[in-house]
Design a protein with these regions (language model features):
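Alpha/beta-hydrolase
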Residues: 56-58
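Sec-dependent N-terminal signal peptides
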Residues: 4-15
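A domain-start/cap signature at the N-terminus of enzymes
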Residues: 17-54, 90, 126-129
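Short, well-ordered amphipathic alpha-helices
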Residues: 39-42, 72-80, 130-138
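Gly/Ser-rich "nucleophile elbow"/oxyanion-hole loop immediately N-terminal to the catalytic nucleophile
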Residues: 45-50, 104-149
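Active-site machinery of serine-nucleophile hydrolases
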Residues: 61-127
Length: 149
């Protein structure tokens, strides 16, 4: 019985590691010199001259960090599903927000009531880097600018 459990755990570990290998590890350096780690899932088969959607997957606060892996925890396997990859071919960007930052604000609001939201503030440095990264991918000829999700 212990051997069966051990083999099962080894199999699950292998699946998880192989998922991380399919997503290319990348680091984007912004015009301000900030770095933004991200993963890129490319198409299995890309047809010359065809445009494909771009999916930008922003994780929650629990996946922030610097390992360039935690952002794959929720959603990473879904995009690798062979049925999804064949039926919905797309480039998938999965950036990782640094542990000391948030995607939207430089400081987290006390509540999310509209009147408490910071209006007129500059976007956070990490979001600025994300915008630049997105612009790079939108300039690529194989990306359909009308299908960014």
């Amino acid at each position: 019985m212990k051997k069966i459990i051990s083999l099962g755990l080894l199999f699950l570990l292998t699946i998880s590691v192989s998922a991380q290998e399919v997503y290319q590890k990348e680091v984007f350096i912004s015009s301000r010199g900030d770095s933004l780690k991200y993963r890129l899932l490319r198409l299995e088969k890309e047809k010359a001259g065809k445009k494909y959607p771009l999916v930008l997957f922003l994780h929650g606060a629990g996946e922030r960090g610097s390992d360039n892996e935690k952002q794959l925890v929720h959603g990473g396997q879904m995009f690798l599903n062979p049925v999804n990859r064949e039926k919905y071919p797309a480039f998938v960007l999965m950036p990782q927000c640094p542990i000391d930052a948030y995607w939207a604000y430089t400081s987290r609001p006390v509540s999310f009531v509209p009147s408490d939201m910071p209006a007129g503030q500059e976007i956070s440095p990490v979001f600025s880097s994300l915008k630049e990264l997105l612009d790079v991918y939108l300039s690529m000829p194989q990306i359909d600018k009308d299908r960014v999700y």
